[in-house]
């Protein structure tokens, strides 16, 4: 599979093509942590600790009807779709990313990733690293995730701001 990666360098986005197979993602860590939270299966492929804080990599397997509410945060996220289609809902506008494509969501941008269809598998690369703290916090509090006020409290403490 070939996809483009868009990297933010200063105020300029540089694009490059990367050839990758889905098996490659298994090489990132021998026993990656999996966080099954709010309908998402999130595999933490690389953490900030493993990359000296430079970035984090998480792989999502998300069924249709599941998704994140509109939110912002202080880090960039690059989404790479491996299977299906992802709607990033940028600023409330549908933004469909197809298999093999990528999209850079800059820090502070309102977005709400949801599958565009029955299922989507994608990789999210957060820069700088540390986004995994959101997923680990949700996993650690999974018994309280039926209370959406508690979910908002948990993600807010991890640096996510729910929009609206």
Where do the PLM segments sit?
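A short, N-terminal "cap"/entry segment at the start of jelly-roll beta-barrel domains
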Residues: 2-54, 142-164
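Short acidic-glycine-tyrosine-enriched beta hairpin
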Residues: 26, 92-110
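Conserved hydrophobic/aromatic beta-strand scaffold that supports enzyme active sites
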Residues: 44, 57-59, 78, 94, ...
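Ligand-binding loop in jelly-roll beta-barrel domains
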Residues: 51, 87, 107-132
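Short glycine/proline-enriched turns and hinge-like loops at secondary-structure junctions
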Residues: 54-55, 72-74, 115-118
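Glycine- and acidic-residue-biased ligand/ion/polar-headgroup-sensing regions
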Residues: 76-77, 81-86, 91
């Amino acid at each position: 599979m070939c996809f483009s990666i868009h990297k933010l360098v200063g105020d300029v986005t540089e694009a490059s093509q990367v050839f990758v197979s889905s098996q490659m993602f298994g090489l990132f860590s021998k026993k990656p942590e999996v966080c099954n939270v709010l309908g998402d299966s999130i595999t933490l492929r690389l953490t900030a600790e493993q990359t000296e804080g430079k970035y984090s990599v998480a792989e999502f397997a998300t069924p249709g009807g599941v998704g994140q509410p509109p939110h912002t945060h202080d880090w960039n996220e690059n989404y790479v779709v491996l299977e299906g289609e992802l709607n990033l809902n940028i600023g409330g506008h549908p933004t469909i990313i197809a298999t093999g494509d990528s999209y850079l969501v800059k820090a502070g941008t309102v977005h709400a990733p949801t599958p565009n269809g029955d299922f989507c598998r994608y990789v999210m690369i957060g820069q700088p690293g540390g986004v995994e703290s959101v997923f680990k916090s949700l996993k650690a509090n999974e018994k309280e995730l039926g209370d959406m006020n508690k979910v908002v409290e948990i993600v807010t403490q991890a640096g996510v701001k729910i929009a609206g």
